[in-house]
Amino acid sequence: LKNFDNTRVYPNDNNNKWIDHLAKKKYFSFLIDEKYGGIKLSTNELSNLLTKIASVDPALGVVTMVPNSLGPGELLTKYGTEEQKDYYLPKLAYGSMIPCFGLTGPNNGSDATGSIDTGKVVERDGKKMIKVNLNKRYITLAPVANLLGIAFRLEDPDNLLGKSGVTVALVERNHPGLIQNTHHNPMNAGFPNGTIKGEFYID
């Protein structure tokens, strides 16, 4: 941490190198159980560690905090199937997957679910799928993430799945129809921030 320089994190060309370095050092695994390769910390331990990291540079604190609070790691731990945990959690723990959590958009911020994006259950090629329309912005780590937790309001007019309401899905980078190539730089904050957009189908 002593050698950290926030110009290396965002937005210059060394961005990916530094994010990759933090991930490989397991800085993003503090909520993941050891059985999956993580460094499971208590809430107090995590708070103390993030405080120390942020004292070196606030941007570095944000880069480290987001995967260890919002998003796929904790959601998978609490709500994921065993198959999902076995597939995703080791990749998150060892840094081959960098997560972000897409919630906010042009019409929803502090009122996070007020005008949230939508996903509609449809039949496509004989399969039940969800057609998602996304317009997310100000998503921390979006420019560098390769595993995206995306929140949307599920619409199921024909009751194909049996439930509607706000839900979260996991989508990997380069999913057909997903657009993930815009950077924001809010107030020169010094951390990767951007948009998640697109219209696409998920199983």
What are these regions (language model features)?
Residues N108-S115:
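Active-site-adjacent elements of ketosynthase-type condensing enzymes
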Residues L1-P67, G80-Y87, K91, S96, ...:
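Amphipathic, small/basic residue-rich leader segments at the start of a protein or domain
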Residues P176-Y201:
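Flexible, small-/acidic-enriched active-site or ligand-binding loops
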Residues Y88, S115, N135-R137, Q180-N185:
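Short beta-alpha junctions and helix-cap segments that line functional grooves
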Residues G119-V121:
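A structural signal for short hydrophobic beta-strand segments in well-ordered beta-sheet cores
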Residues K128-L178:
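A short core secondary-structure module
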Residues D57-E74, L92-N108, N135-L148:
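FAD-binding core of FAD-dependent oxidoreductases
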Residues K35-G37, P106-N107, K136-I139, R153-D158, ...:
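Short beta-turn/strand-loop junction motif enriched in small, turn-promoting residues
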